[in-house]
């Protein structure tokens, strides 16, 4: 006997930062460029460590800096992880629905939408949370 297994269409929720977009490299590279201090990814062991690893006294100071870097937020020019876009495109071409779910500050939504378009992320549905 020969059996064929057909996978049904999946609805896949995908986060951006740390999954598709390399937020850590983005902010540490920009921080080194702006302030001359290199922060290794090995120094970052959990979320929210920007304050002790940088000169910023409060977390809000970090986000105020990240809000306007040469006229755009830190989220505008993040690099993607290797093969992340290709995997999403492949899943989409196979009939699966890609839903973007991302926690973002309100001021970064425009830049994030531009980033999604420029990187041709195959999604028709996007949810932002804070």
State where each predicted segment sits.
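Short, basic/glycine-rich phosphate-binding loops at helix/coil junctions
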Residues: 55-71, 120, 125
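Substrate-recognition element of Asp-dependent hydrolases with the DxDx(T/V) motif
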Residues: 75-79, 84-113, 127-129
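PIN-domain endoribonuclease scaffold, especially VapC-family toxins
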Residues: 110-111, 117, 121
């Amino acid at each position: 006997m020969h059996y064929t297994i057909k996978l049904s269409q999946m609805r896949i929720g995908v986060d951006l930062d740390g999954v598709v977009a390399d937020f850590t490299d983005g902010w540490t590279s920009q921080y080194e460029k702006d302030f001359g201090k290199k922060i290794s990814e090995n120094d970052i062991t959990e979320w929210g460590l920007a304050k002790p690893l940088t000169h910023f006294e409060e977390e809000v100071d970090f986000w105020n800096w990240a809000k306007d870097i040469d006229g755009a937020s830190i989220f505008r020019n993040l690099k993607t992880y290797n093969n992340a876009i290709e995997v999403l495109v492949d899943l989409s071409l196979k009939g699966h629905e890609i839903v973007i779910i991302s926690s973002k500050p309100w001021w970064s939504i425009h830049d994030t939408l531009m980033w999604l378009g420029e990187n041709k992320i195959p999604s028709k549905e996007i949810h932002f949370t804070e």
